[in-house]
Amino acid sequence: MNSDDDSVFNDDLNDSEITNLIHNIPSSSSSCSSSKNKLQRNLYGEIIPEQYVEIDSSKGYTELPPTHHALNYENLSSYIYPTNFEVRDYQFNIVQRAFYDNLLVALPTGLGKTFIASTVMLNFTRWFPRGKIIFMAPTKPLVAQQIKACCGITGIPTSEVAILLDKSRRNRADIWDSKTVFFTTPQVVENDLTAGIIDPKEVVLLVIDEAHKSKGNYAYNNVVKFITRFNISFRILALTATPASDVEGVQEIIDNLSISKVEVRTEQSIDITKYMKQKKIERVTVSPSVEICELVDMLCTAIQPVLSMANERRIYDMSDPSKINAFQVIDASQRLLKNPTIPEGLKWQNYFILQILNVVGQALRRLNIYGIKSFYNYFDQKHKEFTIKFKNKKSNNQTAARFYFHDNIKLILDKCKELIADDNFLGHPKLEILINELDEFFKENEANDSRVIIFTEFRESALDIVSSIERIGSNLRPHIFIGQSKEKEKFDEEAYLSKGKKGRTKGKATKGKQNSETPERSTSRTSSEDAQIKGMNQKLQKDLIKKFKKGEYNILVATSIGEEGLDIGEVDLIVCYDSTSSPIKNIQRMGRTGRKRDGKVLLLFAGNEESKFDKAMAGYEFIQQHIMNGRLITLAQSNRIIPKSYKPIVEKKFIEIPEENTEIKAEEDEDEIIRIATSYMNNKGKKVTKSKSKSKSNSKSKKIEKRFFMPDNVTTGFQNVTSMVRKADSDKSVADKRREKDLLDKLLDSDTEDELLIQSKKSPVKENQSKRPNSEHICEEDSRQETENNSNESNGSFENENDQNKESGVSYPLSYRQTPPKLGIRRLSPQVSMNINLDAPVATEEAAPLVTGKSTSPPENVAEKRNSPILNSSNRECAPKQKTLGLKRRKANSITDQLKRHYSRVIKPNTAYRTITVSDDEKSVEDSINNQQLHKNKNLGSTSDDDDAFDEGDVFDDGMDDELALIANDKLSSFERSLSPNLPAQNNASDEVYKHEFSPGEGVLNQEQMLELYTSYFSLLDPADRVDFYDPLNFNQKPNTSINHRGRIGHSQVSRRLLQSSKFIGSVSTTTAKNIVKRYAQTYNTTNHQHNMHIVQEITNSSSK
């Protein structure tokens, strides 16, 4: 063993250290802090060099090399921070962090989230001149606001800005290729990514507005997932005022957007309090009126039997009818339907019971929070729908019938009709307090041209508020502000009864009648009433906001449409007519005031609204604090895209806004902002008139070709095998092509075996030829050499060679002298000349006798060329390529043919072969040629097909030929020798068979082994787990009272009878008991089981007596 082998076993670790390493146990000398400095060793115990650095598993990712984006290194040394506005500390800090992390920014409304995004976008345009910067907003109005803010704050040139809001634009690919900054919606980006119009590798910055929408399958998530598949070297900046109402929601946003850092500020944060305007929050708790209490009592009395039935069936737990909650009932219904253990009939009975409770829960909520009018509009529709269906036998729900036909229900509806008929009646005390607050507010702020927004959840409630203010308020100009959807169709008794009687004709006529009456009704309705029925599209919403800003309306009664996403303007008073359990909605409502001047918020509470509001806000503040402290959430990891050697230094600078950007900044209309920016985009920074833009847009554009963003140099689409082979051939070198061409030529059936042999012997020449640049040069060189040979040698060279062959007794057929043209790839036509005087003529088979006459002269254009004293290469013709007939399948010879081939290798004295003393090369060539000629002649004389002929070198030599030769010579093969070891071995070598003898006691266990086996498989039982049986022959045995009877095993029939007998023995005297047992022992028979049973039966009978 050498010194290197010795060093393997000279490990400096002891056994305990090795054990700790195997089980990954830290040693006592090392601490947890030094775990990163562990030495890595290979299988031989050697320390691995230091280039193997341990990756910190806590990171969960590998840091990648610098970004693939093109960088402007001159600008990378600094970043610009605009001083056009007040420099705020929190904005300055957030901008710096956005350069290095995927950032989620949560700021209250009005604190400059857009300024942060604009500053980051400005610097990314300086650093990454070819990168794509995308600003996404969920709605078109928000996109217009961001265009105005970004172009007006940072002065990004409009020539580099693109606005993509129309999905049907034909020149989208040209816009994506020519621009760098894009303002669009996430749906447009998602469609263009999937269509292959955008190259995701070019995206360097993604700004997401209203990031709290990044949940579920929203387009924001799909865009980020798609880009991340091809590009991880880009930054994400997510902006929102309220990330989520719970920890799970915040974590979902972080996971979907790959957020690596969160920046959260609240109104109580130290660094933003000095920038916050004063916002006064006033709470008013309203008690229900007498009318509302009476209606609640009557409704509770009517629903009590249904509620009791639900409690008995344990499908709803609440027993107080006045506290029925519709949301809890819906949750119970869903759990009921998902329960597979309940029979279907019972399941649907319980479901219909819960549906009745759901209607009552919704009615109570409307009555307690919104008033009698909202309650009546909802409950009257439900009552009318069921009663008509039940009377027409469309419904057979007896439980619902007992509720809707209850006496109190009729009293409730009649009382509501009576109250609503009064024009001065206000459905809820909230309305009275609201109108008084509005009157006082406008009186105090009459000179300030103030605005008010009132938020409510239901459209009916919004219309009720507008109607009440218009009737009672003075100098109050309210209008409803709702979404685009139409009012839900109410139950129409006439349409329902006519349905199915006369088919669709009646329905169409009724619909046409309603449409004809619509213009007459619209003239009598107010603008708010008409909007409540038809809904408000974006055009109506925009017109209303304009009128609100101008002062035509000073009060907007809005649903959730006004909570976010619209630039409504400065509002001095926010009234929350109702409150929700969502803190996001509450914060967005209150954030509409106090932006540029002080504001006020009025919260109106009724019932349990105040407790829900406090609970929601307290939970939100708790979550915000933990997010700011970095707890309760798990952040993602992101790689740097700015090289580590660069750390940009701030350069505070006043940004000069270009003229075209000033025009966008001064515009208030959102559609006009988009039109101006689009015109600059289409004309590279030059604004044009509408007529020119229309004429230009009408020009036909090229069809967009879909791009597949695969790895570089990847061919897409379907391809046949031929095209793939051709492409592979085009990538090969000339030498590889020549080698492959020669290999294919060998496989062609049109080639003769002698040509293959000669070319195989001329491999050095082929290697030199493969180094030629192309085949044309080779042909030119060959022709030049042929010309030289023709000039140096005489014209009778072929005749001289034939004379020499005659003298030596060697002659070759015509195929060796001149190869006729064949189908297939161009081949060289070699010639062979044996310039050696042999002792005797070489023998051939009978089918091919020696040719002693003159051989046919070669063609005139063929010259002789000798490269060695044995072989003379032939002239090569550069003939044009011809199509081949393809490859022929070769068949392997049978065993008989292989035997014959094997015998042909052995040269015997009685054969036609004679030993010739020549050199090794000459002998190998000669033997090969003779064997091939013999084989060819044999095939010519036989009836077998030419396909049976194949080159000997192509046959795999598995040693069978030698075995068969031994068999033919009456000799034992090695296999037979192994089966017959007693026979005398040849060459004094015999195979030894492994012998093994077994001792007589082999496989029998001794006592020690038996004990070990027993103790391995059996263990002692705990005394508490033992089961003891009573022995009737042992009179000294006492019952074990400590035994736990939980594991008792049942007795057999004989044992049970013995135990019964033992009770009798214990009751008699000792002498009598001994006699009975003695009798049993004397008469016990080991073979007669029936006799023993008889004795036991006698003892038992005697004991019973």
UniProtKB/Swiss-Prot annotation:
Taxonomic superkingdom: Eukaryota
Similarity annotation: Belongs to the DEAD box helicase family. DEAH subfamily. FANCM sub-subfamily.
Any one Pfam family match given in the protein's UniProt record, by short name: ResIII
Record domain Helicase C-terminal: where: 468-641
Residue ranges with Basic and acidic residues bias: 518-532, 764-787
Record-level GO BP terms: double-strand break repair via synthesis-dependent strand annealing; interstrand cross-link repair
UniProt function note: ATP-dependent DNA helicase involved in DNA damage repair by homologous recombination and in genome maintenance. Capable of unwinding D-loops. Plays a role in limiting crossover recombinants during mitotic DNA double-strand break (DSB) repair. Component of a FANCM-MHF complex which promotes gene conversion at blocked replication forks, probably by reversal of the stalled fork.
Listed GO MF terms: 3'-5' DNA helicase activity; ATP binding; ATP hydrolysis activity; four-way junction DNA binding; four-way junction helicase activity
EC number per UniProt: 3.6.4.12
Location in the cell: Nucleus
Domain Helicase ATP-binding per the UniProt entry, residue ranges: 94-261
Keywords, comma-separated and alphabetical: ATP-binding, DNA damage, DNA repair, DNA-binding, Helicase, Hydrolase, Nucleotide-binding, Nucleus
Biased composition range(s): Basic residues: 499-511, 684-705
Subunit structure: Interacts with the MHF histone-fold complex to form the FANCM-MHF complex.
Record CDD domains: DEXDc_FANCM, FANCM_ID
Protein name: ATP-dependent DNA helicase MPH1
Compositionally biased intervals (Acidic residues): 944-953
Main location: nucleus
Annotated Polar residues bias: 927-943
GO cellular component, one term: nucleus
